[in-house]
Design a protein with these regions (language model features):
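Cytochrome P450 C-terminal beta-domain/meander region
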Residues: 84, 174-194
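N-terminal glycine-rich flavin-associated loop
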Residues: 124-146, 172-175, 184
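Short, solvent-exposed loop/turn elements at beta->coil junctions and helix N-caps
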Residues: 98, 167-171, 198-199
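A short, Trp-centered hydrophobic/proline-enriched beta-strand micro-motif
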Residues: 158-166
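Short glycine/proline-enriched turns and hinge-like loops at secondary-structure junctions
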Residues: 104-105, 174-176, 202-207
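Adenylate-forming
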Residues: 137-139, 165, 208-211
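A short core secondary-structure module
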Residues: 189-211
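Amphipathic, small/basic residue-rich leader segments at the start of a protein or domain
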Residues: 1-129, 147-150, 154-157
């Protein structure tokens, strides 16, 4: 293989059509995938390298010096750092631009999340992952237009924190065995939730809850 062909192959980036993933649930865990959707450091684009550098600088200069204080359940410090991450665009990397995000790919989002971990704060990374993943993605993928416009811009900026309520006392984390119900109000304007949820990451601080 010639050098030019090698370089071309290394610099190739692959895009994932997330529309095709809707409705598949956890099928991605057991369905074989081709090498085309696997990324390596050698395939990072210039934009991805830029985000990697910015995230590393934030991790080293902002998160690391206060990491031990964050681990001591310091709400104000955690929320302040969380909002700084939003201002830098780290919370809305793969959220569509029309809803306040950057509209980039999941690979870039993963790179940023990975590099921010160098800051040494496990709890902050869990807070971020729950917010950008299981709290934001359900609205992005399955929310109606009103919900997307109302919540996603503020979740991308860090103004709102999100959480995902799954686990129940009697069902554990088995979503199909959950007993919580949503009943439409008599006037048809809102839903009334009846049930119990426990062990909700970000649950004490979040303003947006997906369940």
């Amino acid at each position: 293989m010639s050098e030019s062909n090698t370089v071309k192959k290394i610099n190739t980036t692959f895009e994932i059509d997330y529309e095709k993933l809707k409705g598949r649930g956890g099928a991605f865990l057991i369905v074989p995938i081709g090498k085309g959707v696997i990324f390596t450091r050698e395939k990072f684009s210039e934009d991805q390298k830029m985000f990697e550098s910015a995230a590393l600088e934030f991790a080293q200069k902002t998160i690391y010096p206060i990491s031990q204080d964050i681990e001591k359940y310091n709400k104000n410090l955690t929320m302040d750092t969380f909002r700084q991450m939003g201002e830098l665009g780290f919370l809305g990397i793969d959220t569509p631009e029309e809803y306040g995000g950057l509209g980039l790919d999941k690979t870039t989002s993963c790179i940023v999340c990975d590099v921010l971990a160098y800051g040494g704060s496990v709890s902050l990374m869990v807070t971020m992952a729950a917010h950008t993943g299981i709290a934001t993605l359900p609205i992005t993928w399955y929310g109606n237009e009103f919900q997307k416009k109302k919540y996603l811009p503020k979740m991308s900026s860090g103004e709102l924190m999100g959480c995902y309520a799954l686990t129940e006392p009697s069902a554990g984390s088995d979503a199909l065995s959950g007993q919580m119900k949503a009943d439409l109000s008599d006037d048809g304007k809102y839903y009334i939730l009846n049930g119990q949820k426990i062990y909700i990451t970000n649950g004490s601080w979040a303003e947006v809850c997906v369940t």
